[in-house]
Amino acid sequence: MYIVDVKGDHSVLTAEYAAIPAEMKSVAAYFGKEYLRQLPAEIFYENLAEVRQHTSDRAVIRAHHFFTENLRAQEISQALKEKDVERFLKLFSLSGRSSFVFLQNIYPSFSPLSQPASVALMAAEHLLGGRGACRIHGGGFGGTIQVFVPNDMAQQFCTEMEKITGEHSCHLLSIRPCGGIELMQNQQ
C-alpha cells in the first residue's frame, strides 16, 4: 500500500472539518436524536424530503454516507477475515467513491479550482488501469490518498505518480497481519 502526499494545505480547513459532524448532527436532531448512530437508517430514508427541507442537501448526502459507510465497514471486516482480497478492494473503492460523492471531503468547498487530492485520485485510477484501489486517507480535504498497488506495478506506479504529485510524495507502507500491539519496556 502506498500513501501519496498530494501537497494539500490544511491550514485553513477547520470549518470544513467541523461542518461534517455538525451537518450529520443536524439530521439526527431533526429526528430528536443527538447522533446519527441513534437513528435507524430506514427512518432516515423514509423521510428524505422532510429532512432536506429542515437541514440541507449536503447534510442529507453526508448522512447517507454515514449509513452506507457503517454497513460497508462491516463488509470490509468480513472480507478481510475471509482473506477475500478482491472483495476488500472493491469495497475499499466504493468507500472512496462515497467519500468523494457523498461525504464530500476531497477538496474544500471554498476552493473548487484547486483539487490536488482529486487529481491524485484520478491519476491513481488511471495508472492502476482497473487493478488495485485508491481513496482519500484520514479526514480528507487534500492531505494524502491511500493506494493499493499490485506488486508488479509498484515501481512504475510510484515513478509516474511522483511526476504528478512531486518527488518523494509516494511512501510504501507495510501492513502487519497482527494489527496494533503494545510494546513494553523490559524492567530488569
Which residues does each predicted region cover?
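C-terminal nucleotide
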Residues: 1-135, 147-188
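N-terminal pre-core extensions flanking Radical SAM catalytic domains
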Residues: 142-145
